[in-house]
UniProtKB/Swiss-Prot annotation:
Any one Gene Ontology molecular-function term assigned to this protein's record: mRNA binding
Subunit structure: Part of the 30S ribosomal subunit. Forms a tight complex with proteins S10 and S14.
BP GO terms, sorted: translation
InterPro entries, alphabetized: KH_dom, KH_dom-like_a/b, KH_dom_type_2, KH_sf_prok-type, Ribosomal_S3_C_sf, Ribosomal_uS3_bac-typ, Ribosomal_uS3_C, Ribosomal_uS3_CS
UniProt xrefs under PANTHER family: 30S/40S RIBOSOMAL PROTEIN S3, SMALL RIBOSOMAL SUBUNIT PROTEIN US3C
Record lineage: Bacteria, Pseudomonadati, Pseudomonadota, Betaproteobacteria, Nitrosomonadales
Record-linked PROSITE patterns: KH_TYPE_2, RIBOSOMAL_S3
SMART domains to which the protein is assigned, alphabetical: KH
Protein name: Small ribosomal subunit protein uS3
Residue stretches making up the KH type-2 domain: 39-107
Residue ranges crossing the lipid bilayer per the database entry: none
Family: Belongs to the universal ribosomal protein uS3 family.
Amino acid sequence: MGQKINPTGFRLSVLKNWSSRWYANTKKFSVFLNEDINVRQYLQKRLAHASVGSIIIERPSRNAKITIHTSRPGVVIGKKGEDIEILRKNVEKLMNVPVHINIEEIRKPEIDAQLIAASITQQLEKRIMFRRAMKRAIQNAMRLGAQGIKIMSSGRLNGIEIARTEWYREGRVPLHTLRAEVDYGTSEAKTTYGVIGVKVWVFKGEQLSVRDRQN
């Protein structure tokens, strides 16, 4: 089961937490879910060059709190906070409630799975050889403390006629162990030959469960 399932979904309530944290009744649920999808799409498009790893959406009573995890907080905030204020006003229009935006810096982007996947796809779009991009990402991750990393690229790699899948792996990546902190990220490179999909698994070590850490 651990081989096929999304590693983040598999560990929800054990090690991982939800990226949307709110409760709604039956009528409001679809409305809130649609708003969350629109907000995420807007932020990912607007902050495409800001190295955003994850977006957390919380909804306390009649307002919203959005936490953006990024390795380049200065790009998100902008000069004297101008960019983040524009961002906040646009998100408020999408959600129809007062919004507070919080920025958290990713200290080690080299071991963040989503940022690794995004970096590889950017290199593929610039026509850098996929093997070089994948090997460089693995070396950087292992150098900065990852205990294991696995990368998969799938599509018309280097413009070949028949699409294929390539894997690179170093260290240990336990997919079945629930207490193993496995970070997972995906991205797509849109090249002249078609779309190339990239998946990244990063093993950062074994952790206590969320419940044990709270007790």
